């Protein structure tokens, strides 16, 4: 199955596509971006464009100027940012691609286009470059929302420093974007505390700047999929709890990366190239947030290889000890288990009332 088609089947409804200025291998340049954006558009997915303003990865540890821009002063960089942003978005618009959000910079917690746009060196330069990108976006897509994206969504001091700095220097933005990775939290993988701190930060950003907030990146190790699902389910729930309804979405970064792809272990596919149970957090999300886990009566009949229930459910899923969905059925009061090996399984049952129930069953 093609990647975007598969992710859409898992109830993901939006895609975030990065673009580099002049990458050496061509991946993530404007032409490559157009191919991916067309694919997403044809699937009816909502689209975010993520400008790195670099020839390769830009992140908190590096914000390297594109090779062609290295000699530019501030005014030259403002012009280059505006032209690059305008040119890429015009290409998409001319191909009838609807763009809903645009990031001007990627994880710019200390600015971008170092050293000129490094926030700790010159917040005013960083604000000017951000505004150059913002204005260029609005020229092409007046209704697109522009995102300034910062890492460590739990770090309120960092966010106040950056957005106070932008505000005081004439910076423009529509949405505050956050990354949240529990592996980077003060206590590694303490996702509950990370999520709590992130929600507090999101609410503070809404109060302080009256801007929407969005989780534009998150992830957790692929080999603790059940934990990752709990993290994501809670994060999605908390984002929907942001005051005044101003939490606008959650994106998983590179969910399709698997195992130890290029040294990255925070994807959500296993070593066989299949999505893990973590991504179930995105399924039917408006409904799932209101579900309540309870036990229910379950019966296993080895003779006919069947699990049966005392009521009919909208959907039933059987999950292995490894966290994989191994059986599903809809509108049913039983499910055949003939193809399953002996062992312990979790059965999730979604009632027509919208209530989710869980039970453990031993097949022998």
What are the functions of these language-model segments?
Residues 299-300, 305-307, 344-364:
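C-terminal tail/sorting-segment detector
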Residues 30-31, 59-165, 169-173, 185-200, ...:
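Active-site cleft segment of glycoside hydrolase catalytic domains centered on the general acid/base Glu
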Residues 204-208, 223-234, 238-296:
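Aromatic-rich peripheral "rim/lid" segments of glycoside hydrolase catalytic domains that contact
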Residues 2-58, 120-147, 192-202, 206-208:
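Aromatic-lined substrate-binding rim segments of carbohydrate-active enzymes
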Residues 15-17, 47-51, 100-104, 146-148, ...:
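Hydrophobic faces of well-ordered beta-strands that scaffold small-molecule active sites
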Residues 318-326, 345:
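Short, glycine-anchored, charge-dense loop/turn motifs used at functional sites
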Residues 20-22, 52-54, 104-109, 149-154, ...:
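Active-site beta-loop-alpha junctions enriched in small/polar residues
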Residues 289-317, 334-335, 339:
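Glycine-centered coil/turn sites that cap beta-strands in beta-rich domains
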